[in-house]
Design a protein with these regions (language model features):
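Short, hinge-like loop/turn segments at secondary-structure boundaries
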Residues: 51-55, 89-90, 137-141
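A generic structural signal for short hydrophobic patches within well-formed alpha-helices
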Residues: 10, 41-44, 127-128
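Generic structural signal for small/hydrophobic residues in well-ordered secondary structure
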Residues: 6-7, 44, 82, 113
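Acidic, PIN/NYN-like endoribonuclease modules and their adjacent C-terminal/linker elements
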Residues: 110-148
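Generic detector of contiguous secondary-structure segments
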Residues: 24-25, 60-80
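Active-site neighborhoods of divalent-metal-dependent phosphate/nucleic-acid chemistry enzymes
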Residues: 70-121
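Histidine- and aromatic-rich ligand-binding microenvironments
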Residues: 5-6, 37, 101-103, 124, ...
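Short, well-structured N-terminal submotif of metal-dependent ribonuclease cores
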Residues: 1-37, 46-64, 146
């Protein structure tokens, strides 16, 4: 099983000592199968408000996964699937993507996870609505207790 963390989980890790400790314990068992999504990298970098935050993010998160060649990058197919997912949900639920911009990133993250066989670790309940349309992918709450 492979994993990637959603932005909300990594923000907690960066801000909260107990979340950082839980992440370290998780990585001690699963670092070899844990990836950083390029979608999450985008969101984290966009949220860095100071040069110090950006530097820390680059050194502590991005480079850690880049050096290990574990950055999950969505393909053109993942973008297409994400677009189809958003269109289906918009038609079913009566909303537009521009009214819910965070769902665009979430749809791309879900589609790329499915494409790569990666389980998403998240606290975001919006992913449950994707499961009704996007089959064959998994998301779990932090921190999964699975056997190696």
């Amino acid at each position: 099983m492979k994993f990637t963390c959603d932005t909300n989980v990594l923000v907690d890790v960066l801000r909260d000592a107990s979340a950082e400790e839980a992440f370290s314990v998780f990585l001690s068992r699963f670092s070899h199968v844990t990836y950083l999504s390029a979608v999450v990298m985008l969101e984290l970098r966009a949220g860095a408000r100071t040069p110090g935050q950006a530097r820390m993010l680059e050194q502590e998160v991005v480079q850690r996964f880049a050096r290990a060649n574990r950055v999950l990058t969505p393909s053109a197919d993942a973008f297409s699937v994400a677009g189809q997912l958003l269109a289906t949900l918009a038609n079913r639920e009566g909303w537009t993507a521009d009214a819910h911009p965070s769902l665009v990133h979430d749809a791309l993250l879900a589609a790329s996870c499915r494409e790569s066989g990666v389980t998403l670790i998240t606290r975001d309940r919006d992913f449950a609505r994707f499961k009704t349309v996007l089959r064959g992918w998994r998301f779990v709450a932090p921190w999964p207790q699975v056997s190696q």
